[in-house]
Amino acid sequence: MQERKITISNRLGLHARAAAQLVRRASQFTSSVHLIREDTGDEADGKSILSVLLLAAPCGTCLIIKTDGEDDARAISALAELVEHKFGEEISDGVF
């Protein structure tokens, strides 16, 4: 089992497109993926778009990613990288 704390830092937060990217990436791994919103304790299945969207995580929200399974280390690294790179939405000057 792996666990990592991340902060949503893209301007629009975890909106539909970003959530879809996260779910697609999570679905590439056999490990289970759960996202927990640190401030509310709300938990989402990282492989369910509806579940992820229901977190309603704006910019600045701290999430805990938990993965469990044979490829959990690779899964958590891939998901953290996606979030850290702001889902590929923003270029260096902060404009889409």
Report the location of each language-model feature.
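N-terminal loops that bind phosphate or other acidic moieties
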Residues: 3-4, 8, 95-96
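Compact, glycine-rich, soluble single-domain proteins
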Residues: 7-59
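C-terminal structural segments of small proteins and small subunits
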Residues: 58-96
